[in-house]
Every structure is written in structure tokens, then in C-alpha cells.
């Protein structure tokens, strides 16, 4: 009765190129692909509306010290069966630009001063109104070793934090690893969801 965990990988340069193609970044392509995959998975659902994605926004400045330097936010993406991958990526980019002027950013100094447990609780409460939580975990800039042997892959699995699904990206070397955590009580076909997500990443990399 625990979480369902699945993963897949793709070329990091391909994902980066997909983001650059619309003037964005790896994270732009990542969030767009997650929204597309979740939308495809729910294509036969009677419910309609935008895909609500919870994403952490970094607030760290160059001279920041230790502590929390992120704030949770939600983007509502209008994604449907006829949506072109690049168009969804452009919508993500527009939302990201708008977040820089979000009045809620004035609360960032307060959030960064809070204890980790308090910040995590706030993030969990905010995520409960989302369809999926998407996280891009910073990668190691160097090759890692364990017991003298090189680590070949790093597969990330993020907490649900109140959402039904968490999709996490961690790049290692030249590979982007995608980990999917889902609540079996909310996702009846986790294998189907993972397939839809993998297909959406492939479609975004190919372009539209």
C-alpha cells in the first residue's frame, strides 16, 4: 500500500534543445512534457479543465547563504488532445515570466526564514490543490562514486506532498532521469501514466 514508483531516461541535450527551441530551458521542456503526459493520461476522463502543476520557484541569489531559497507556486496549463508540444512549452514560458511579477513573491523573505519543517508543511498544503507536482533536482557537477565504484545512474523519486503524482527530473552526466511517484488510491493505472509521460517527452524532443 505504498507509493508506485516508475522511471525512464532520455538524453539531456535533447531535452535542453527542446527548451531552447522556444526560448526556454530544460525546466521549460520538463514542465511542458509533464503537463502533456498527465493530460494524455486523463484524455478519457469526464472532467475537463487545465492541468494544474505545482512547481518550486528558486529565489536564491548569488550572495545567499544556507536556508530555504524556494517558494511553491502553481501553473494552470491549458492542454488538450490537439495541443502541440512546442505550444505547451511556450505557455510554460509565459507563465514562468509572469511568476517573476507575482505579488506573492513579496512573502519570499518570510518563507526563507522559516524552519524546514514549517516550509515543507506549507508546500504540502499548497500542493493539495494540484494535479501533479513537478520538481527539477539540481545535479552533481562531478561523477559520483560509491564504495570505489562509479555511480551509473541517479533515479529521483520526490514526495507527493499532497498531490496524486510527483514527477522529478535529475540529470546526471549527459542523461536526464525522470522518476514518477504516484498514489495507487488516486492513480488506477500507473503504468499507463508512465507510458503517457514517456511518450510526451519523446514528442516534445521531436518538436512540432
Where do the language-model regions lie?
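Low-complexity, glycine/alanine/valine/leucine- and proline-rich hydrophobic stretches
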Residues: 131-202
Amino acid at each position: 500500500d505504498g507509493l508506485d514508483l516508475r522511471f525512464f531516461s532520455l538524453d539531456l541535450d535533447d531535452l535542453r534543445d527542446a527548451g531552447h527551441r522556444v526560448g526556454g530551458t530544460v525546466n521549460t521542456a520538463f514542465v511542458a512534457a509533464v503537463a502533456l503526459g498527465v493530460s494524455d493520461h486523463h484524455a478519457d476522463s469526464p472532467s475537463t479543465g487545465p492541468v494544474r502543476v505545482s512547481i518550486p520557484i528558486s529565489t536564491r541569489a548569488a550572495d545567499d547563504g544556507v536556508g530555504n531559497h524556494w517558494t511553491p507556486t502553481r501553473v494552470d496549463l491549458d492542454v488538450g488532445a490537439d495541443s502541440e508540444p512546442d505550444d505547451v512549452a511556450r505557455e510554460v514560458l509565459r507563465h514562468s515570466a509572469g511568476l517573476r511579477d507575482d505579488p506573492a513573491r513579496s512573502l519570499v523573505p518570510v518563507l526563507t526564514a522559516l524552519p524546514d519543517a514549517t516550509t515543507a508543511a506549507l508546500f504540502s498544503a499548497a500542493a493539495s490543490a494540484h494535479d501533479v507536482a513537478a520538481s527539477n533536482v539540481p545535479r552533481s557537477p562531478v561523477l559520483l562514486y560509491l564504495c570505489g565504484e562509479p555511480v551509473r545512474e541517479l533515479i529521483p523519486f520526490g514526495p507527493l506532498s499532497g498531490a496524486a503524482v510527483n514527477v522529478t527530473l535529475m540529470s546526471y552526466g549527459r542523461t536526464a532521469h525522470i522518476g514518477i511517484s504516484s498514489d495507487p488510491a488516486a492513480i488506477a493505472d500507473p503504468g499507463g501514466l508512465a507510458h503517457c509521460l514517456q511518450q510526451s517527452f519523446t514528442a516534445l524532443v521531436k518538436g512540432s
